[in-house]
Amino acid sequence: KAIKDMARDAKTAFMPQCGLAPGFIGIVAHHLAKGFDSVQDVQMRVGALPAFPTNSLKYNLTWSVDGLINEYCHPCEAIHGGESISALPLEGLEHFSLDGVEYEAFNTSGGLGTLCETWAGQVRSLDYKTVRYPGHRDLMQFLLGDLGLAADQENLKAIMRKSMPTTMQDVVLVFVTVSGQKNGMLLQEVFA
């Protein structure tokens, strides 16, 4: 919202939310949704994971530490029951497997960009969750909640930069599930 206010009278173009999430994930969701007569539910799941995790968090730095901590510490926009809500980060835990590999997914902030505003009044549910290897979420809850590092994010960032290796050998998972009405039938389409 602050960016929209700054851009309102600007003389230059600024195109935010053009990454993986937000960005690509929203394009995929829109592409799937346009094939329906009416959309009911949109679920988006994205994970950028190390191909070869070697620590208890089962995570290596694959992008910005600042962005990582930000998405774990701030409220998450979503739509449930047709109403815009603020969901807690690290909540809404799900488990699934793909090609024999186990994963977990949980609420994180920012991945929807402006989709809650775009689809307000048009969908029953819309949410975004980050995908990680099992156990990651519980350890992050311990660090952020039990140890209080959510209130000391700069220290947590320093610890992660010092202790967690960066890798370019990553795996990106993208799942988008859209369900709704098409030709009088309730259907579901998935991008994976």
Feature annotation, model-predicted:
Residues 1-14:
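Rossmann-fold NAD(P)-binding glycine/threonine-rich loop
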Residues 35-192:
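C-terminal catalytic/substrate-binding lobe primarily of soluble NAD(P)-dependent oxidoreductases
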Residues 18-28, 33:
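Short alpha-helices
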Residues 1, 21-24, 47-52:
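Short gly/pro/ser/thr-enriched loop/turn and capping motifs at secondary-structure boundaries
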